[in-house]
Amino acid sequence: MESPIRIETVDINTILKTLPHRYPFLLIDRVVNIRQDYSGIGIKNVSFNEPAFLGHFPERPVFPGVLMIEGMAQTAGVIGIMSVEGTEKPRAVYFLTIDKCKFRKPVLPGDTIEYHMKSIGRRKSMWWFHGDAKVNGVVVAEADVGAMLTD
C-alpha cells in the first residue's frame, strides 16, 4: 500500500523559491505526489532547445546522463525541503554522493523524464534517496543520491 500524499504538486514557481538553481541548470519542471514516506516524482520535459544538445551530440542529440542524475538530486532536494516540518525550513541543498548509478537507455528531445525518488535513509541534516528515471514507464537511469539540507 502506498503512503498517503502530503503535497499533490510543487509547481515551477515554488521550485524557484525552494532551490537555488536557475537556467540553464534547473533541471526539473515540477514535482508531484510527495508522500509521507518522503517519496515523490520530479518531471522534466526535454526540449531540443536544451543547451546540452549544442554539443551532446549535434548530429544525434542525447540528453546527458549526468544531467539526469542532477535532476534526481534536485527532485530529492525538493522532497526533503518540502517535507521538513515547522518554520525553520532549510535554505540550501548540497549534493553529497552518487552511488549505484546506471544509464539504461538514451533520452531524446521530446521525451518527458519522471524522476521517481524515495528516501532510503536520513541522519540529522543528511538524506539519502534511491531514484529511477523513467520515460514512458521504462527505466532509463537509476542511482542512489545523498544530500545535505542546511541554512
From Swiss-Prot:
One BP annotation, GO: fatty acid biosynthetic process
InterPro entries hit by this protein: FabA_FabZ (IPR013114), FabZ (IPR010084), HotDog_dom_sf (IPR029069)
Domain of life per record: Bacteria
Gene Ontology terms, MF aspect: (3R)-hydroxyacyl-[acyl-carrier-protein] dehydratase activity
Active site: 56
UniProt catalytic activity: a (3R)-hydroxyacyl-[ACP] = a (2E)-enoyl-[ACP] + H2O
Keywords: Cytoplasm, Lipid A biosynthesis, Lipid biosynthesis, Lipid metabolism, Lyase
EC number, as in UniProt: 4.2.1.59
Pfam families attached to this UniProt entry: FabA (PF07977)
Compartments where found: Cytoplasm
Recorded family membership: Belongs to the thioester dehydratase family. FabZ subfamily.
HAMAP family assigned: FabZ
Functional summary from the UniProt entry: Involved in unsaturated fatty acids biosynthesis. Catalyzes the dehydration of short chain beta-hydroxyacyl-ACPs and long chain saturated and unsaturated beta-hydroxyacyl-ACPs.
PANTHER family tied to this protein: 3-HYDROXYACYL-[ACYL-CARRIER-PROTEIN] DEHYDRATASE
Protein name according to UniProt: 3-hydroxyacyl-[acyl-carrier-protein] dehydratase FabZ
Species, as recorded: Rhodopseudomonas palustris (strain BisB18)
Top-level taxonomy: Bacteria, Pseudomonadati, Pseudomonadota, Alphaproteobacteria, Hyphomicrobiales
